[in-house]
UniProtKB/Swiss-Prot annotation:
This is Potassium transporter 5. GO terms for biological process: positive regulation of response to salt stress; potassium ion transport. Its main location: membrane. The lineage of its organism: Eukaryota, Viridiplantae, Streptophyta, Embryophyta, Tracheophyta. Keywords: Cell membrane, Ion transport, Membrane, Potassium, Potassium transport, Stress response, Transmembrane, Transmembrane helix, Transport. It is a multi-pass membrane protein. Pfam families: K_trans (PF02705), K_trans_C (PF22776). Signal peptide: none annotated. It is found in: Cell membrane. High-affinity potassium transporter that functions under low potassium conditions. Involved in the positive regulation of salt tolerance under salt stress.
């Protein structure tokens, strides 16, 4: 027994020694709280980001599953191109057999250079934490270079776990000079923004042109009924397609993939059949000599025909835009192993058929199908066309949703149709506008040849924009060697410039349509973003002074009412100018008041545990806080009850930590969790809280097992315990517990949302153009867009509005 007591005392002495060692390290590593709280920082919590290693590696089974799904989502558009490429390339007739070989050679090397080399092996790597598309490129660039037109950057944002991309090379003076030039030039920022919204507008325009050309081409298989009947049937299919959008595409990957895979099997198999039956010698087209000979023979007409050849790569941008649903390896495997071989066989087979029947060029695809397979192929072709249309329509919805998050599009209703597939959204207003536009295009153009003229411009324009933006990313983000940047830029821009010049030649024959549509969208997006920026600048210049808050705290006429008030503003720093208007109209304040700013970051997603930032608004006893809620452009806004729960849990954790800092004296540091995978605090329901405690310093503990089960005594006599997830925290002092209980009681009394309705007008001294843009164009868009409360998912029964006029 004595031995046991001795061992126990010895253990206690050893534990005490270890505890003192821990305390000494805390003292050695202490951080001055006064120095840490920068003017531009919200709180210490902003600097505590998850140390979780984001594992982007996916096992081969998951990759194969994603590969299969990607076939149905990504390749419908490029897969249906064989329906109309030869018809668009030879609108009149085929001059000679050598011309067929020349066009086939052009198609082969266009497929090799643009989709395969450029996109599959280069552009896909320029993703924004797994997301692709023009906005993703802009967002990626915005995180490395301050090119955003809205000055709401915070140091805390750069510390998010998804914010930074690992740079593959050493820093170079060249990239720093380019970065400095871009950050200091307002014109470059505006140009980059305009190029971005031009690219997104073109992709949205594809949501109109793809359904038209794909469905018309597929239905043309029953051309014996006459062109008017084909147009009528196509319009009926399109109406059904758009009306079905509200049902969602939850099973899009697995349900569409078998059909598109069957389609590629059909076109590849039929192509091989025609190749061996009619003329296997067309494989000579792999020799680029036939491509150059084609231009020598045909001159200007050969150049014009490139507008049809480029349709072979329609849908290439979808590989990049839809990357967020899959991964790079899945796209690379599916394109290289299935799509590319099937397309080569299809085009080679059609070329072999045309060498024997050149007069059938206007119906190449259907004429080349063996009779027993005609109707099965027709059915699968219509299904593939619908799927291709579906993918582009869904892509248009996703892009507009991203635009909304970045303040570049009027507020519209966004419905998330899938809990499983992120980014699957439905926008009713946009859906019916696209449907009407599709019907008008079908009625106006009637043939795939004219629609192809319009389609080509949209396809090539987006490719040119992608080339330019990836080049900038190579310079600034990747810091690639100049020789490789030169090869990439000049190699692809020359090819795309030739194609662009060809499709622009057909401007009057339908090419004006995507440009007009994109210009219209750019005006809407530009006006909305401009006012969004100016509103933010107005609030920043007119934010409430600290003296006003102090006077308010001392004002006996201001009543405190039970509950939590959430006052929404776009400001990430300071108290918004709408607050005095609330006080003037309603001379009372809730027992807990939180100034909430919804901030969209230039990244696809923000982890839930990194979403909330808090800071106390002095005086402390007044219980006023600021909160920045950060979302990525693919994040969905939570339901009110869940949002309130997350915010209150985060606020209580902030209060706990504030008291730990203020009461801890020298021990102003907390330790690193032993397991970085579990750095979030857990609520009672076992779910990660929205606002987690993150660690600033690593603490090497002499005996983790003993420390985790025991206590650490600081010099002040305060006992701090170490939780199961490795976080050393102080026990709640009376004031902290009381304040947290006040917050909890206030939540139980109810949460009220306070929303300022700003009427934006131009200053009297503004130009006539600015007055028209602000007073008429913007206000027309605002009146016809969705209310801010609905966009933020604020329950109407608990919403209080106060109006104010902003002169910008």
């Amino acid at each position: 027994m004595a031995e046991e007591v001795g061992e126990t005392r010895g253990g206690e002495g050893k534990e005490k020694t270890e505890t003192m060692a821990v305390e000494n390290k805390l003292k050695e590593r202490k951080i001055s709280w006064a120095k840490l709280r920068r003017v531009d920082s919200l709180n210490l919590e902003a600097g505590r980001v998850s140390k979780t290693q984001h594992n982007n590696q996916v096992n081969w089974k998951k990759t194969l599953s994603l590969t299969f799904q990607s076939i149905g989502v990504v390749y419908g558009d490029i897969g249906t191109s064989p329906l109309y490429v030869y018809e668009s390339t030879f609108p009149d007739k085929i001059g000679s057999k050598e011309d067929i070989l020349g066009v086939l050679s052009l198609i082969i090397y266009t497929l090799v250079l643009l989709p395969m080399l450029k996109y599959v092996f280069i552009v896909l790597r320029a993703n924004d934490n797994g997301d692709g598309g023009t906005f993703a490129l802009y967002s990626l660039l915005s995180r490395y270079v301050k090119v955003s037109l809205i000055p709401n950057d915070q140091p805390e944002d750069t510390q998010l776990s998804n914010y930074k991309l690992e740079i593959p090379s050493n820093q170079l003076k060249r990239s720093e000079k380019i970065k400095e030039k871009m950050e200091n030039s307002k014109n470059i920022k505006i140009l980059l923004f305009l190029v971005t919204i031009l690219g997104t507008s073109m992709v949205i325009g594809d949501g109109v042109l793809t359904p038209c050309i794909s469905v018309l081409s597929a239905v043309s298989g029953i051309g014996s009924l006459g062109q008017d009947a084909v147009v009528g049937i196509s319009i009926a299919i399109l109406i059904v397609l758009f009306c079905a959008q509200r049902l969602g595409t939850d099973k899009v990957g697995f349900s569409f993939a078998p059909i598109i895979l069957l389609w590629f099997s059909f076109i590849g198999g039929i192509g091989l059949y025609n190749l061996f039956k009619y003329d296997v010698s067309v494989l000579r087209a792999f020799n680029p000599k036939y491509m150059f000979d084609y231009f020598k023979r045909n001159g200007k007409q050969g150049w014009i025909s490139l507008g049809g050849v480029v349709l072979a790569v329609t849908g290439t941008e979808a590989m990049f835009a839809d990357l967020g649903h899959f991964n790079v390896q899945a796209i690379q495997i599916s394109f290289s192993g299935i799509v590319f071989p099937a397309l080569l066989c299809a085009y080679a087979g059609q070329a072999a058929y045309l060498t024997k029947f050149p007069d059938d060029v206007s119906k190449t695809f259907y004429k080349s199908i063996p009779d027993p397979l005609y109707w099965p192929t027709f059915v699968v072709a219509v299904a593939a066309a619908i799927i291709a249309s579906q993918a582009m329509i869904s892509g248009a919805f996703a892009i507009i949703s991203q635009s909304l998050s970045l303040g570049c599009f009027p507020r519209v209703k966004v419905i998330h149709t899938s809990a499983k597939y992120e980014g699957q959204v439905y926008i009713p207003e946009v859906n019916y506008i696209l449907m009407i536009a599709c019907i008008m295009v079908c009625l106006g153009f009637k043939t795939t040849e004219k629609i192809g003229n319009a389609y080509g411009i949209a396809v090539v324009a987006v490719m040119v924009i992608t080339t330019c933006m990836v080049t900038i990313i190579m310079l600034v983000v990747w810091r690639t060697k100049m020789i490789w940047i030169a090869f990439f830029f000049f190699g692809f821009i020359c090819i795309e410039a030739v194609y662009l010049s060809s499709v622009l030649y057909k401007f009057k024959d339908g090419g004006f349509l995507p440009l007009a549509f994109s210009f219209f969208l750019m005006i809407i997006m530009g006006i909305w973003h401009y006012i969004h920026k100016e509103r933010y600048m107005y609030e920043l210049k007119n934010k409430v002074s600290r003296e006003f808050i102090r006077e308010l705290a001392a004002n006996p006429n201001i009543n405190r009412v039970p509950g939590i008030g959430l006052l929404y503003s776009e400001l990430v720093q300071g108290v918004p100018p709408i607050f005095p208007h609330f006080i003037a109209n309603i001379p009372s304040i809730h027992s807990v008041l939180v100034f909430v700013s919804i901030k969209s970051l230039p990244m696809s997603k923000v982890a839930l545990e990194e979403r909330f930032l808090f800071r106390q608004v002095e005086p402390r006893e007044y219980r006023m806080f600021r909160c920045v809620v950060r979302y990525g452009y693919n994040d969905a806004v939570e339901e009110p009850q869940e949002f309130e729960r997350q915010l209150v849990e985060g606020l209580k954790e902030f209060i706990r930590h504030e008291h730990f800092i203020s009461e801890g004296g020298d021990a102003e540091t907390v330790g690193e969790p032993e397991n970085p995978q579990s750095s979030t605090l857990l609520a009672k329901d076992g779910k990660a809280r929205a606002s987690a405690v993150y660690i600033e310093e690593s603490l090497q503990q002499p005996n983790p097992s003993r420390v985790s089960s025991g206590s650490i005594h600081s010099n002040s006599g305060i006992k701090s315990t170490k939780s199961s997830n490795g976080i050393i925290s102080a026990p709640l002092q009376g004031s902290a517990a009381e304040e947290m209980q006040i917050v909890q009681n206030a939540m139980e009394k109810g949460v009220v949302y306070l929303l300022g309705e700003a009427e934006v007008v131009a200053e009297p001294k503004s130009s006539l153009f600015k007055k028209f843009v602000v007073n008429h164009a913007y206000n027309f868009l605002r009146r016809n867009s969705r209310e801010g409360g609905k966009v933020l998912a604020i329950p109407r029964a608990r919403l209080l509005r106060v109006g104010m006029t902003y002169e910008i």
